[in-house]
């Protein structure tokens, strides 16, 4: 299983990302699990080192993607982070 953590505060972008992931899963037959977080603060608070990749929006309320990435790096050096 491939696990993706996604921090995105815009519901329309969340929907678009979900649709792309579902389409990719069907086309490739790869088992992908995506977890959405409303902002960087929620991601950092709930983070567990189970993700293969994190997709972070840079501009979000409470905690932006750059600050969230710095906090995650303190706990997990291996996860790939994409902005």
Predicted regions and their residues:
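Two-component/phosphorelay signaling modules centered on CheY-like receiver
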Residues: 10-35
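Acidic, metal-coordinating helix/loop segments flanking the phosphotransfer/catalytic sites
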Residues: 34-53
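Active-site residues of response regulator receiver
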Residues: 56-58
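Short amphipathic alpha-helical segments
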Residues: 18-19, 48, 67-68
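Short amphipathic alpha-helix used as the core "switch/output" element in two-component signaling
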Residues: 45, 66-77
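Non-catalytic signal-transmission and effector/linker regions of two-component phosphorelay proteins
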Residues: 1-5, 15-18
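Acidic catalytic/metal-coordinating carboxylates
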Residues: 39, 64-67
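A short, hydrophobic beta-strand element within the central beta-sheet of small alpha/beta folds
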Residues: 78-83
